[in-house]
Amino acid sequence: YANLLCNEHGMDPISFGATIGAVMELYEMGVLTKEQIGIDAKFGSAQALAHFAEITAKGEGFGKEIGQGSKRLTAKYGHPDLSMSSKGQEFPAYDARGIQGIGLGYATSNRGGCHLRGYTVAREVARIPVKTEPLTADGKPELVKAFQDATAAYDSSGLCIFTTFAWGLPDLADQLAPACGPEFTLENVATIGERIWNMERDFNNRAGFTSKDDSLPKRLLTEAVKTGPAKGLVSK
């Protein structure tokens, strides 16, 4: 239901969900009260999630604050480290502490904490085309750059990013060349992707972003995973 409301009202479900997570944490800490937010909002409450989706979609009451996103909301209430975001964009469901490559991708993505600008999860988790160990940071800078450049090329082609589960850059070049000209070789397509990425980065730099913005929330760097295969790890 909450996802439907997000789609119907032009709200990003990922950013909305992460912002609600921050609201629930602030509530459990006692920073926010039931009187302020209109409902008992213990973490995991489906009723609270639906309520927040409704008031955010309508811009009513506390929903106006939720609509500002987790970065502004948590800063307003004195706990900016609770915003799970990079460059103001909230993270999706992949924990950067247990998937080291995607953590670097979140930090360096030109548009913020986005998994679709370098989906290393394909290699680190789904093993497409081969598995790369997710728990180590070794080799991840090279992997992340390759994915980011390739994704930029794919996005510019108009193809759905999900096709990359089956196709690589050679397949993209093979389709572009007959349609657009023989100059679209594998090497040139790879260069196009890198150039697009660099132009985006140049735009960000001119807009005031610096290397300090290529970062992760403090808690991902200091609070270790408590259970599961990544137990004891932080983002490296």
Segments the model singles out, each with a brief description of its role:
Residues 1-236:
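Extended C-terminal regions of large enzymes
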